[in-house]
């Protein structure tokens, strides 16, 4: 049987303490990239961004129902705060955000919901987060985990607990993001075919609702 001497215990525990301390002194890195590097790269890309469009695949996991729903469509953003995204498939709908107003148009039901948009509404309009990632330092606390940038809102943001960003080394710096809310529901958004600064007009973000559509207004 090997007898562990007091000096050996001290050496081992001392080494562990040194390694833990050393890890805290190092900047947070993933493959040589620090949190600050990633944030700087994203915010620099946003400085030159006027508009953006592309495709998305959204997977929403609802914990209580143990169900995952998948949606596909297109999104369009004109900074600072004009958005349009179109869900394709059986239940088509279009969502418009223009500054502090949101309109959700459901084609099949021939109805539209109109309401206010603010920080508390982000959880219901996840693609809108893309318009705000140019202000990461102001809006979020950031860290790195498993190669992803983890963002936690500094102020309440519609029940959002954290956002995981998968960054891209080419073109637009955000490849996908995951939103976790207070109920541990999870929303994954994967972006593709992204084009930037194509000259989207402001009028594109104003819905042209056909006659006969019922408009339901909600004010918070």
Question: Where in this protein do the model-derived segments appear?
Answer:
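An acidic-aromatic
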Residues: 72-124, 187
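Bacterial N-terminal signal peptides that target proteins for export
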Residues: 3-18
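Bacterial N-terminal signal peptides
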Residues: 16-27
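Extracytoplasmic
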Residues: 49-51, 70-72, 80, 90, ...
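Flexible, processing/modification-adjacent segments and terminal tails
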Residues: 35-37, 41-62, 66-68, 104-161
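Boundary at the C-terminal end of the N-terminal hydrophobic targeting segment
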Residues: 30-34
């Amino acid at each position: 049987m090997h007898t562990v001497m007091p000096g050996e215990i001290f050496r081992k525990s001392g080494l562990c303490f040194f390694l833990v301390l050393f890890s805290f002194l190092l900047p947070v890195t993933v493959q040589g990239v620090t949190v600050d590097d990633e944030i700087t790269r994203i915010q620099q890309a946003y400085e030159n961004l006027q508009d953006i469009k592309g495709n998305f695949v959204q997977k929403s996991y609802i914990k209580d129902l143990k169900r995952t729903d998948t949606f596909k469509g297109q999104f369009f953003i004109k900074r600072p705060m004009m958005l349009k995204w179109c869900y394709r498939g059986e239940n088509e709908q279009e969502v418009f955000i223009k500054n502090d107003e949101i309109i959700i148009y459901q084609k099949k039901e021939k109805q539209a919901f109109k309401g206010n948009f603010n920080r508390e509404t982000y959880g219901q309009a996840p693609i809108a987060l893309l318009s705000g990632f140019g202000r990461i330092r102001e809006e979020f606390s950031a860290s790195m985990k498993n190669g992803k940038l983890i963002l936690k809102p500094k102020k309440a943001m519609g029940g959002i607990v954290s956002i995981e960003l998968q960054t891209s080394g080419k073109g637009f710096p955000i490849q996908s993001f995951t939103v976790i809310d207070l109920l541990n529901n999870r929303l994954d958004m994967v972006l593709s075919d992204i084009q930037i600064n194509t000259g989207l007009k402001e009028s594109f973000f104003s819905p042209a609702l056909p006659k006969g559509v019922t408009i339901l207004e909600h004010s918070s």
